[in-house]
């Protein structure tokens, strides 16, 4: 018996179930939320996130929708994060909405302990950073459409 602490590695699906439970309960001050994109997704890969634009920034009063994809190596590897809502941020590709790990340290320095909640909170903090807080934002909603990798134009309509 050594004096070193043994770390218990929680299996991927148990970890995602914990995150789902936490997301369903509501987190923090209510300015970020997340949950499963498809309840029938038995691999628990596709998630949605929401960030309410922080006060006193160019994002104030806006609701930003995101897609998070947790591959088979999550939580060892970070999820892929894509803004569905149009947004102007230094770490987001303006063409496809993907958060660029090379410009968002949390993704490039991902650790197993990080969660989707942590990720959304950090993106909200990034919105408040000096380099992003005053950036001019695209028109409301997704009226211009965002072209996906297959060349399709993605549009959103709320009825």
Curated annotation (Swiss-Prot):
Upregulation details from the record are:
Not induced by stresses.
Q: Which family does it belong to?
A: Belongs to the ubiquitin-conjugating enzyme family.
Q: What does the protein in this record do?
A: Has no ubiquitin ligase activity on its own. The heterodimer with UBC catalyzes the synthesis of non-canonical poly-ubiquitin chains that are linked through 'Lys-63'. This type of poly-ubiquitination does not lead to protein degradation by the proteasome. Mediates transcriptional activation of target genes. May play a role in the control of progress through the cell cycle and differentiation. May play a role in the error-free DNA repair pathway and contributes to the survival of cells after DNA damage.
Q: Which GO terms describe its cellular component?
A: mitochondrion; UBC13-MMS2 complex
Q: Which residues form the UBC core domain?
A: 11-159
In which tissues is this gene expressed?
Answer: Expressed in roots, shoots, leaves, stems and flowers, but not in pollen.
Subunit field text: Heterodimer with UBC35 or UBC36.
Matching InterPro entries: UBQ-conjugat_E2_core, UBQ-conjugating_enzyme/RWD
Protein name listed in UniProt: Ubiquitin-conjugating enzyme E2 variant 1B
A single BP term in Gene Ontology: postreplication repair
Lineage runs: Eukaryota, Viridiplantae, Streptophyta, Embryophyta, Tracheophyta
- Which organism does this record belong to? Arabidopsis thaliana (Mouse-ear cress)
């Amino acid at each position: 018996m050594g004096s070193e602490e043994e770390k218990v590695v929680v299996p991927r699906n148990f970890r995602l179930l914990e995150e789902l439970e936490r997301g369903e309960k509501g987190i923090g001050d209510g300015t970020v939320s997340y949950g499963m994109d498809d309840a029938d997704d038995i691999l628990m890969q596709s998630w949605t996130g929401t960030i309410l634009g922080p006060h006193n920034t160019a994002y104030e009063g806006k609701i930003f929708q995101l897609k998070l994809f947790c591959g088979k190596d999550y939580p060892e590897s970070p999820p892929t994060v894509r803004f569905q809502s149009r947004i102007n941020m230094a770490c987001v590709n303006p063409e496809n909405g993907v958060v660029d790990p090379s410009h968002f340290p949390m993704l490039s320095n991902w650790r197993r302990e990080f969660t989707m909640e942590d990720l959304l909170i950090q993106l909200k903090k990034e919105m408040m950073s000096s380099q992003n807080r005053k950036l001019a934002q695209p028109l409301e909603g997704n009226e211009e459409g965002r072209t996906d990798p297959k060349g399709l134009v993605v549009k959103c309509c709320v009825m």
